[in-house]
Amino acid sequence: MSFNHQQIEKKWQQYWADNKTFKTENETEKPKFFALDMFPYPSGAGLHVGHPEGYTATDILSRFKRMQGYNVLHPMGWDAFGLPAEQYALDTGNDPAEFTAKNIATFKRQIQELGFSYDWDREINTTDPAYYKWTQWIFIQLYKKGLAYVDEVAVNWCPALGTVLANEEVIDGKSERGGHPVERRPMKQWMLKITAYADRLIDDLEEVDWPESIKDMQRNWIGRSEGAEVTFGIDGTDENFTVFTTRPDTLFGATYCVLAPEHKLVEQITTVEQRQAVEDYLEKVKMKSDLERTDLAKEKTGVFTGAYAVNPINGKKVPIWIADYVLVSYGTGAIMAVPAHDERDYEFASAFSLDIVPVLEGGDISKEAFTGDGQHINSDFLNGLNKVEGIAKAIEWLEEKGVGEKKISYRLRDWLFSRQRYWGEPIPMIHWEDGTITPVPEEELPLMLPKTDNIRPSGTGESPLANIAEWVNVVDPATGKKGRRETNTMPQWAGSSWYFLRYIDPTNTEAIADPELLKRWLPVDIYIGGAEHAVLHLLYARFWHKVLYDLGVVHTKEPFQKLFNQGMILGEGNEKMSKSKGNVVNPDEIIESHGSDTLRLYEMFMGPLEASVAWSTNGLDGARRFLDRIWRLLVNEEDGTISAKIQVSDDKTLEKSYHQTVKKVTEDYEGIRFNTAISQMMVFINDCYKAEVIPTAYAEGFVKMLAPIAPHIAEELWNLLGHEGTLSYEQWPTYDESKLVDDEVEVAVQVAGKVRAKIVVAKDASKEDIEKVALADEKVQEYMAGKDLVKVIVIPGKLVNIVVK
């Protein structure tokens, strides 16, 4: 017999909605638990089966914690600004707001059909002016703190599309859409000074319970390195440039320098003979994105400027080259090259026949660079020193001579915050005709995104907002001064950098949220989402949170106490699901055919939550069979009432199995090991089928344990067991340690050195009693027939050894 999932699921979803079962009150007597999902971008495609995996995990924890007596905050919202909606609007002429609203409605319907216990009264949407008012407010605070500034930055400009592209949108020097040529062009952009927080962003990772791999990715992205900044003079001029190096002890091996093609000195120092070659090279570089330029596998290219630098440590002249693998935005935009001990420098020097001088002992530089450590050679006063001594001595010498100093450098760059797009938060700044910039007065926020039916790119590199003259042009009422609004919009990362705070108090018009409520709910207790957000989103959110901490808005240094990354659900052939491969599984169809409880159970049973696993229709059918098995065990086939097997009883048959199950499921839910919790529930159900009687208390306890994973069928069974309303706030079952231990033990019996039988005796049986039972055993008597008993050795609880002759 099977249960009618469609009827049961609709019934309980309606009940939860009508009764606002999961509405979170701000009560203070209960401990709090804030379970957060990475909110989705509502695309046109709707949910696929990968989305519910993380959402089911947070839902299990939320339902589990409610039953443990926690006040649970479990919200959902929409990260709804972004390129796809704008692209759709460009292609169809429709308003991106309409497209977005339609997509949100689809996502919300699908999410509700999966039975997640969200408090929908806290739903947020980053495109809602009441929400982005506070995104703009945060930007103004960043500006006031000197953390938002305008800078001229090289961007990927696509003349054909009339817009700037992100690095990810450029492939081999052409736009991903349409394959148009892309060039590098300097443009004024808003930047956020995330580098000012670099050390704190590294150090505070110690305070959070995150996967070590994600912490390492963030540390590497920030890329803190200690070394020295060294000044190289340019031969025959008063000019100089600085390089950062982690190995100032290898300066004696620096045989050439490389400047980024965009370095401000290039034009000045290039000789007449080399000018044409340098200009040709600069043209080529314009077509490449930073990602292509720094690809380690690509062929090394570069050109000699004709100029020489003076190595400060030995006075030798070294040639100055330009090469695309040096970026002006990274470090000082110049490097010293020590080809004997660096693979990239070695390849470059070999390609262009430049000198290679070893300064560390070991290796064979005629074959390859030696990147190991050895004593210093060919290094004058550093000879014979090891790495640590050499670095210290070199820095001391550089500082003494005034040509260098100890320095910490970071790989992290400031965050380029401008987007030349329409569908994003307007940046609330005004550029005045006298060259000053001021924020929009805070009382005038939100600065609304104007409605327009022309969101074509402006063609000037500005966003489509530049086309809306009546919005762009402003006059200061006090002075009559003319100004222009900032026409760039914020990136999609903006709204997601603080959204978790708004769930705490989503309708507050006076502040991001009530300070007392922020104190009550922060930090987020568990944040579950994909590892693809390991760096950018998580780093940006941590940065904004630290700024808000410094402003006194929040009281925690870190926003997310525990982070968990679910794995990916792959197609049946172990490939990533994608529309182009035609292997996307739509949850709507599964909910229709198998039910959302089955989908939730299956996705949690596929394997460890953090593993990537292939979708299997057989596995899905197996999950449904398990739920059918539970239903058949507990419900009469004929009349749909509760089975006669379930009785108020103190029958001990299932006692150990039940207490083991409560212990295992409780610990596995806490540890986010849902697959093994389900395995244990399967063991218990098997035991129940073998038992004559199932005590009512055990049936009720089991239904409570099933509820976080399969909430609809659990609610229905709870009602059939004679209860009214929802089990969402019922007390979580408890176990008794003493019931996990058997009263009886199995003891092996050896006759003449071989195990001949196994006997079961009371755990506390005396040696005499154990001996009696052993000697009375039929098999033992068989092997003793015709032999004399010499002695019996009893090791209680383990072994009886019968010696015969």
UniProtKB/Swiss-Prot annotation:
User: Where does the record say this protein resides?
Assistant: Cytoplasm
Where does motif 'KMSKS' region map?
576-580
Q: Which residues cross the membrane?
A: none
* Catalytic activities: tRNA(Leu) + L-leucine + ATP = L-leucyl-tRNA(Leu) + AMP + diphosphate
Top class in the EC scheme:
ligase
State any GO BP term from the record.
leucyl-tRNA aminoacylation
Which amino acid positions bind ATP, per UniProt? 579
- Gene3D superfamilies referenced in this protein's UniProt entry, alphabetically: 3.10.20.590, HUPs (3.40.50.620), Isoleucyl-tRNA Synthetase, Domain 1 (1.10.730.10), Valyl/Leucyl/Isoleucyl-tRNA synthetase, editing domain (3.90.740.10)
Keyword flag Transferase:
no
Entry protein name: Leucine--tRNA ligase
Where is the organism placed in the taxonomic lineage, from the top? Answer: Bacteria, Bacillati, Bacillota, Bacilli, Bacillales
- Which gene specifies this protein's sequence? leuS
